[in-house]
Amino acid sequence: MADPRALVIGGTGPTGPFVVEGLHERGFDVTILHGGQHEYEFAVPNVRHIHEDPHFQEPLERGIGSQTFDLVVAQYGRLRIIAEVFKGRTERLVAVGGATGIFAPDTDPRWGATGKPALFADSSTVYVREPGEDGANKIGFRMVEAMEALFENHTAGAYSATYIGYPVNYGPRSPGPYDWSVIRRVLDGRRSIVVADGGIKIDSRVFTANAAAAVLLAIDEPEIAAGKRYSVADDNAFTMRQRIEFIASHLGHEFEFVDMPYELAWPCYPLWRHVRGHRLTLSTLIRDELDYRDPVAPDAAMATTVDWLLANRPAPDGELERQIGDPFDYEREDQLIARWRDAREALGTVESPLPVQGHQYRHPKAPGEAWKPGPS
């Protein structure tokens, strides 16, 4: 009996090799279809390559010809095109997309009077429903369109579909490696680093090996995963300041943090990804249904990421640095820091008129003693 056939669309990026090698270990005959811009030496033999661009229908159809597959894992390209092309060509389609970008913006009234929560259930269906003025939400709108087309085909019986959403990836080979904003400043000998609002912003992220493990779990459980949308994020999320401190410590460096309001703190915008507030997602469903757990702990994941970037440094003003959008303009950063310090000095000492904050509950020293302010 022939081995089951799997097609991985992508396969050479940050999570692809883990998925390809995991499929091989599960007995699949694996083919990858990708644009050919990046190659990878897999640790398993006999992985066939098709070089076509999966962003467009004609090249994708040309690449697969009359072939059919037991499983397609779509990690790259345009999902709305892939979802259509593989109708009747595969039994299962496991698609990877976004975990946070599919949800409506903060101002959408469907979130209710309290607005969009900083953290909300991964079962939420408050999706982006219009591109927005000047196309501000166009990418999220297209992502939702593609995801819903995928599930429409699932309902129609074209194939069994599963969608797995990632927040921003980090790890070896990741595009837009935002941690490089910190690493390069260490390498360049910067002593000061600008942070906004105390560095308390938190983004959900997923380490590449952890993300791939989630995909493989969905592949292992076809009946449970059928028709499901999962989100997967690392179990622990850290503040920006914690991330900066970890990188600096790992490299034997110490920064002086220059804290200022977000409106002024433009040097940190690339690391903050130009959003002041948190970007968080839960991954409750995949943990409950598929028993997903992070295979790689956060300290090991972050250390691996830093070490890989040290060994594979992005070229100055090259593709990766342009994806990050950090100019590393230290002259203007120093000017901003100097102006901020001057402004703080001119403001002088600000005295606080606040009283001692009392605990909410009574801490009586004798029976019947009433609540009173002050420490317990």
Regions found by a protein language model. Give the residues of each.
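N-terminal Rossmann NAD(P)H-binding glycine-rich loop of SDR-like oxidoreductase domains
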Residues: 4-26
